[in-house]
Amino acid sequence: MNYDVILIRYGELALKGKNRDQFEEALVKSVRNVLRSFFKVKVRRNYGRMYVELHGEDAYAVMERLKRVFGISSFSPTIQVDPDIETIKEKALELVRQLNPQPRTFRVVSRRADKRYPIQSMEVNRMVATHILRALPAISVDLHEPDTIVNVEIRTEGTYISCETIKGLGGLPVGVSGKVLLLLSGGIDSPVAGWMMLKRGVTLEAIHFHSYPFTSERALQKVRDLAHKLTKWGGTVRLHVVPFTEIQTAIREKCPEDYLITIMRRFMMRISERVAENTNAKALATGESLGQVASQTLESMDTINKVISIPILRPLVAMDKVDIVDISRQIDTYELSILPYEDCCTVFTPKNPVTRPKPRLAAKFEEVLDVEALVEDAVARTEIEEITTKPKETTTDLF
């Protein structure tokens, strides 16, 4: 079947009231961005609907791209026809005939958005269903759980018929919720956290703490590759690479071993807050899950939070590890995340880290460090890489 138009539906956007136009424009921008290599395609919107006019492009190739776009509730490949009822009946039958496998049951659902159309929706349903039943006596109507729903949308700009509905990612279009800075470690959790934040409509930048020579160039490349995976859903990611060796060395030499992770995380938050301020990010995001490791108890989170004022978003906080792993497989980050390259947290992990650190003790242990000087130096030497949607393409400059 040669489809004419892909009809895009968006559910949550319809609830946004006064901001509706802004949200719809952001979704149009996202759709145009993922379809930019389909030169014949045109994207337009009308109240409550968006249309991708194919002009001969492969409908299924286009729909594969649409599966990456947050903010889409569902979409359907459609044929556009004249509003003449006989034409509607014939084209609906043609669509049902080409389904493989053939459905055993069906239902017709028409929507008469153009109220000038002379036939009521219920009558359109009856006429189209009767025509299909006469031509295909092996199938029957089921109004409750049909194998196939034949959708007929009669609108002022055209009549659209479809038999397939593909579920979209849902969520909100990227860019409508402000900017968030993701702490990207290279493990399983943080890329999933980034993906979930993208689903809530944020623009994503990432920060990574690199401890060369304790961590290798391959560990940094793994993080670049994970950031590249996220560009599939959110576009270009600016990756801030922070030199962290001097800070970790100072902490290891001067602070109690059981508080190493806690103090190290407090430094990460201080640096991340500075970078967020410089990039106009309104929150940090981490891959922490409550109770998963020693540094992710409520007491640890509280002690770490004390040193900054910017919000910290933890989208995985109530998730089980198995659910996080499932998402990482779905978004194709799992195999990268389990590559055996150590990050800055794992190379300095103490044997018995404190699980219920006290903010007062953490602050006292930090008194032997020149906290402000260490933070300022790390921020000054941070490098930025632009991770684009193109394979493994990066550009580097100084922060």
UniProtKB/Swiss-Prot annotation:
UniProt entry keywords in alphabetical sequence: ATP-binding, Cytoplasm, Nucleotide-binding, RNA-binding, Thiamine biosynthesis, Transferase, tRNA-binding
Example GO biological process: thiamine diphosphate biosynthetic process
GO molecular function: ATP binding; CCA tRNA nucleotidyltransferase activity; tRNA binding; tRNA-uracil-4 sulfurtransferase activity
Keyword Membrane annotated: no
Keyword Protein transport: no
SUPFAM superfamilies named in the record: Adenine nucleotide alpha hydrolases-like (SSF52402), THUMP domain-like (SSF143437)
Main location: cytoplasm
Catalytic activity: [ThiI sulfur-carrier protein]-S-sulfanyl-L-cysteine + a uridine in tRNA + 2 reduced [2Fe-2S]-[ferredoxin] + ATP + H(+) = [ThiI sulfur-carrier protein]-L-cysteine + a 4-thiouridine in tRNA + 2 oxidized [2Fe-2S]-[ferredoxin] + AMP + diphosphate; [ThiS sulfur-carrier protein]-C-terminal Gly-Gly-AMP + S-sulfanyl-L-cysteinyl-[cysteine desulfurase] + AH2 = [ThiS sulfur-carrier protein]-C-terminal-Gly-aminoethanethioate + L-cysteinyl-[cysteine desulfurase] + A + AMP + 2 H(+)
SMART domains: THUMP (SM00981)
Pathway: Cofactor biosynthesis; thiamine diphosphate biosynthesis
Entry binding sites for ATP: 183-184, 208-209, 265, 287, 296
CC annotations in GO: cytosol
Domain THUMP: start-end pairs: 60-165
Annotated EC: 2.8.1.4
Protein's cellular compartments: Cytoplasm
Function: Catalyzes the ATP-dependent transfer of a sulfur to tRNA to produce 4-thiouridine in position 8 of tRNAs, which functions as a near-UV photosensor. Also catalyzes the transfer of sulfur to the sulfur carrier protein ThiS, forming ThiS-thiocarboxylate. This is a step in the synthesis of thiazole, in the thiamine biosynthesis pathway. The sulfur is donated as persulfide by IscS.
NCBIfam families linked: tRNA uracil 4-sulfurtransferase ThiI (TIGR00342)
Protein family membership: Belongs to the ThiI family.
Full protein name: Probable tRNA sulfurtransferase
Protein source organism: Brevibacillus brevis (strain 47 / JCM 6285 / NBRC 100599)
